[in-house]
Amino acid sequence: MGKGNNMIPNGHFHKDWQRFVKTWFNQPARRHRRKQNRIKKAKAVAPRPAAGPLRPVVRCPTIRYHTKVRAGRGFTLREIRAAGLNPAFARTIGIAVDPRRRNKSVESLQVNVQRLKEYRARLILFPKGKKVLKGEANEEERKLATQLRGPLMPVQQPAPKSIARAITEEEKDFKAYQYLRGARSIAKLVGIRAKRLKDAAENPDDVTKAPTAVKRNKT
């Protein structure tokens, strides 16, 4: 049958069509194989978390999705150092590091630094050699260690807490989309406008260098 408001398909079968029928009888076996591979991987990385290394909390790209958060590729070098860790050491204790990523806001830096500190507080670090160093677990603590099979510190969407109240006249007149578009335009053209003002100050007689003010109509 067709899906949605689309045309009902007609196969027009010709030329011994039975030979070209695709079957999916291997789906149960594939499901079993995926499960066995997950178990095999969990045993190989034990006692480390089966889900892999810790990932940062990042915003989704584009205006459409930037209100949502998800798990990113790796923590920035700035986040790692702000949490009191070394990037090389962080990789050895199950923390993903992405040197290409940059922090564009103080909020993202604070959230991920707190995430790293919380992970470090929960972590039971096994000693590499016979001698137990500072920050490593002793024998009693190592006996309590169990492998985490589920998601490692899953990312949760921030729930907005709003109280019901009357909408003010100022809020009714405020156009959020136009305000955001204007703010992005100002941020984009700040360098061009600064250069234009500088050129106009250096050449006061040049009419082409003078800044032009454009008055926009209210919509």
Swiss-Prot record:
Keyword 4Fe-4S: no
Keywords associated with the record: Cytoplasm, Ribonucleoprotein, Ribosomal protein
Annotated GO MF terms: RNA binding; structural constituent of ribosome
UniProt superkingdom: Eukaryota
InterPro entries listed in its UniProt record: Ribosomal_eL13 (IPR001380), Ribosomal_eL13_CS (IPR018256)
GO cellular component: cytosol; cytosolic large ribosomal subunit
Pfam families: Ribosomal_L13e (PF01294)
Tagged with keyword Ribosomal protein: yes
Stretches assigned to coiled coil: none
GO biological process: translation
Main location, first listed in the record: cytoplasm
Region (Disordered): 198-219
Location(s) in or outside the cell: Cytoplasm
Job of this protein: Component of the ribosome, a large ribonucleoprotein complex responsible for the synthesis of proteins in the cell. The small ribosomal subunit (SSU) binds messenger RNAs (mRNAs) and translates the encoded message by selecting cognate aminoacyl-transfer RNA (tRNA) molecules. The large subunit (LSU) contains the ribosomal catalytic site termed the peptidyl transferase center (PTC), which catalyzes the formation of peptide bonds, thereby polymerizing the amino acids delivered by tRNAs into a polypeptide chain.
HAMAP family: Ribosomal_eL13
Subunit structure: Component of the 60S large ribosomal subunit (LSU).
Protein name: Large ribosomal subunit protein eL13
